[in-house]
C-alpha cells in the first residue's frame, strides 16, 4: 500500500513516498435491479468496507503532532484513508417509446440517481482534523435516447447543491494548518450524441 505523505520538517514542502508494510481491506457489496417492461427500471447497491494498516511503523505524524519531538509514528492498526465504512447508490428511470426527427427506435426518458458515503479519513496518518463527514449527492437527467442516430439530454449533477469536501490535507510547510479540496457545486449541462 503506497501513500503520499509530508515530511515532518518545517519548511520542507516536498512529500515522500512511504510504504505501509501490510494492510488489510475486507468488504461486501450487495446490488440489485428491476425492470418493468421497457418503461420503468430501478437499481440500487450498498457496500461495507473495512480497511486498516496491519503494519506501518514509519508513518508520518498526524497533523496535530506536527512539530513535536518525533518525525514518524507507528500507526499499525489504524484505518486506511479514503475508505467509508458504508457507501451506496440508488436510482431509477422512466422511459416511453417515441419518434424524434423520423427515428422510431428511441425513447424519451427521465432518470434520477443518488449516491452516499459515510465519514472517512482523508489523511495517511489518522488525524482528528482531517476527517470528512458523510454526504449524499443527487443527479438528474432527461431527454431522448436512441441506440442508433441522434440522442440528447439535459442533466444536473449535485442537484441539491450539497456542500462537501473531497479531501482535507496538510498544507505546505508542515506548520500545522490544513487545506481542503471542495466538491463540485450544482452543475447543469447538455449532451448531444450521434451513434452510427
Give, region by region, the residue ranges found by the protein language model.
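Outer-membrane beta-barrel transmembrane strand signature
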Residues: 15-16, 109-110, 125, 139
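C-terminal beta-signal and adjacent terminal beta-strands/loops
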Residues: 115-123, 144-196
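Short, surface-exposed loop/helix-turn segments at secondary-structure junctions
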Residues: 124-131
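Gram-negative outer-membrane beta-barrel transporters
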Residues: 18-121, 195
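Solvent-exposed loop segments that connect transmembrane elements
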Residues: 3-16, 54-77, 124, 166-181
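Residues that define the transmembrane beta-barrel architecture of outer-membrane proteins
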Residues: 24-26, 84-88, 134-138, 184-188
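Extended hydrophobic-aromatic, low-complexity segments
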Residues: 4-7, 44, 100-105, 120-124, ...
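Short, basic/aromatic-rich helical patch in the C-terminal catalytic core of site-specific tyrosine
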Residues: 30, 140-142
Amino acid at each position: 500500500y503506497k501513500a503520499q505523505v509530508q515530511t515532518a520538517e518545517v519548511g520542507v514542502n516536498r512529500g515522500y513516498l512511504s510504504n505501509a508494510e501490510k494492510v488489510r481491506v475486507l468488504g461486501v457489496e450487495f446490488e440489485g435491479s428491476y425492470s418493468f417492461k421497457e418503461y420503468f427500471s430501478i437499481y440500487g447497491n450498498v457496500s461495507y468496507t473495512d480497511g486498516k494498516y496491519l503494519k506501518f511503523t514509519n508513518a508520518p505524524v498526524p497533523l496535530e503532532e506536527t512539530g513535536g519531538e518525533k518525525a514518524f509514528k507507528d500507526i499499525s492498526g489504524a484505518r486506511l484513508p479514503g475508505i467509508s465504512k458504508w457507501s451506496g447508490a440508488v436510482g431509477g428511470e422512466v422511459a416511453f417509446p417515441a419518434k424524434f426527427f423520423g427515428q422510431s427506435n428511441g425513447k424519451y426518458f427521465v432518470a434520477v440517481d443518488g449516491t452516499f458515503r459515510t465519514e472517512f479519513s482523508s489523511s495517511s496518518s489518522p488525524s482528528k482534523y482531517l476527517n470528512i463527514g458523510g454526504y449524499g449527492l443527487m443527479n438528474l437527467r432527461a431527454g431522448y435516447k436512441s441506440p442508433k442516430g441522434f440522442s440528447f439530454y439535459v442533466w444536473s449533477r449535485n442537484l441539491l447543491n450539497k456542500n462537501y469536501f473531497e479531501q482535507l490535507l496538510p498544507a505546505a510547510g508542515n506548520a500545522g494548518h490544513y487545506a481542503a479540496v471542495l466538491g463540485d457545486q450544482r452543475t447543469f449541462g447538455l449532451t448531444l450524441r450521434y451513434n452510427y
